[in-house]
Swiss-Prot record:
EC number: 2.5.1.7
Species this protein is from: Rickettsia prowazekii (strain Madrid E)
Enzymatic reactions: phosphoenolpyruvate + UDP-N-acetyl-alpha-D-glucosamine = UDP-N-acetyl-3-O-(1-carboxyvinyl)-alpha-D-glucosamine + phosphate
Residues passing through the membrane, by range: none
Subcellular location: Cytoplasm
Top-level taxonomy: Bacteria, Pseudomonadati, Pseudomonadota, Alphaproteobacteria, Rickettsiales
Protein name: UDP-N-acetylglucosamine 1-carboxyvinyltransferase
Amino acid sequence: MQKLIIHGGKPLEGSINISGAKNAVLPIMAASILTNKLHITNVPKLTDVSTMKDLLRNHGACIRIIEHTDEFELIINTTNINKFTADYEIVRKMRASIWVLGPLLTKYGKAKVSLPGGCAIGARQVDLHIAVLKSMGAEIEIEDGYINASSKGRLKGTHFIFDKVSVGATINAILAAVLAKGETVLFNCGREPEIVDLCYCLIKMGADILGVGSSTITIKGKDCLNETSYKVLSDRIEAGTYMFAAAITKGDVKICGIDYNIIENIALKLIETGIKVVQINNGVQVTYKGKLNSVDLETNPYPGFATDLQAQFMSLMSISSGVSMITENIFENRFMHVPELCRMGADIVVRGNKAVVRGVEMLKGAEVMASDLRASVSLILAGLSTNSKTVLHRIYHLDRGFQDLEKKLSNCGANIKRV
C-alpha cells in the first residue's frame, strides 16, 4: 500500500495553480443524464471523478476523455441510458453517487440507487433527499440497502422546506426539479459556490432557475434540456488547504486561478491569525509575518467556514501561540484526525463537537494514518511544519480530492514523495 514520506522544516515559496472543484464537477457530471450531451472542461484528475465516470458508464453513458497536462475534458453522451440501477460496488466508493437519483427519476421515472459510501465522517443520512423527491410525487422505498424510486408520469413541482441546510439534498432536488412539471420552490437551500456552479451549468442547458446563490431557489420545470459545454469553477477547498500550507510552513505562496470571492472567508480567518493575505490578479498571496495567533473557529454552511477545511485549520492552530476552540457544527464525527495530530505532539482535547487546541512550539514527525480525505491533508500540513520525518499511511483517501498534491507542494520547495 502506498504512503507519503514528508521531511518538514522548509518554508513553501512559489505559486500553486488550483484545479477544478471536485464538489462542483461531480453533480455537473450527474446532470449530464438530463440532456443528450454535455462537454465539461477544467475537470480535475481525481479518483472520485473516475468513480463518477464508471457510474455513468454503468448506466449506459458514452464518455470521451480529452487529457491535458493539468485537467481533463469530458464529453458525456447520455442518449443511450439503459440501466437505472446504481450498484453497491460503485456507490460504496463515493457518497456523491446519490446525485444520479434525481436525474434518473425525473427523466426516466425510475431509479434504484444503493445507499452511499464515501468518507467515514458522520451519518449524513439520505432522509432529506427522499423527503423532497416524495414531495414531487415520487414513490420511494428503501429495500435491501437500496433506494428504490419511481414516479407515475413526470415529477411535479413542489414547495419544500429543508429542515436543515443540506448541500447534497439541495443538489438532488435541483437536478430533479429542472424537468419536473410546474414550479418548484426550495427553501433553506445550501448556498455553496458548487451549488451555484451547478445552477449556472443547468441554466446554460436551458433550465429556468431563479434565486441562484440564495437560500430560496425557484425552478420552473422544462420538457427537456439542451446540449452545452461548461467550465467547472476552481476548488476553494484546495485553495484554502494550500493557503494554510503556506502559513504553517512560515512560507510565501501565491495561490492562483481562484475567485477571491469564494475564498474571502478563508482569507479573513487567516488574517485574524496574523498571516498576511493579499488579493492578487487571479488569486491571493499568503505570507507568514513572524507570529501565528490562536483564534476560535466554527464550521457552518456557506458563507460560513467550510467543514472541509476544519482539519487543516486545526493543524495550523496546533502550533499557534495560545488556545483556540474549534467547533464542528456540520458532521458529528469529524475529529478523527485529532489522535494522529496528538501523536505528532499536538495538545488537543475533544469535548463533544468542540476541540480545545493549545498551541505548541513545534510538532514532531511520526508515523500517522489518514482516516478520511480532509484528515489526510491536515496530517500532511502538520508534517510539513516539523523539522523531522513524517510517514502518512492510507493515502488513497488523498487521491479522491487532491490532484497532483505532491507535485504542487514539491514545486514550492516541500520534501514529499510517494512510495
